[in-house]
Amino acid sequence: MKTVLMLLLCSCYFIKQVNGQENNEVIKPDFITQIPRDIEGCTGLYTFDSTAFKKKAYIIETDLRQTAYIKINGKLIKLKLLNNKNLPGETYKSTYSGDGYTVILISKTVKQIDVEKSLDSGTLEIIKDKQKLKVKVHGISGC
């Protein structure tokens, strides 16, 4: 009887540990190397790595209107715009949500490339449950 009880307790503990690991999965953004079809026209393309930027590999892609994409742990996630704010100093804050994630992109125009395009820098914050990841990003936005 004691053996059965010990096995039962060990099994319960193991199941709790496995479930806990699933809920505490680390947020790991992956590079998106192909722009999704519904992102066309004006875009915001951001990464945290200059080499990746040259290779056209981004961690967030937006249509500068209603849709953005991120790739987390190998899964492409479509996000919908919740809120867009103009902040002082050519700074913009866009909040997106989808598939349990909240994503906050804050970008500031660093250099105007031409009439319709600018070089931007800022931060990207990805939140899911109690997990948060905040990274510096840079990229290009415009039409």
Which residue ranges define each predicted feature?
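Bacterial Sec-dependent N-terminal signal peptides
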Residues: 1-22
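Cysteine-centric segments in proteins
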Residues: 21-143
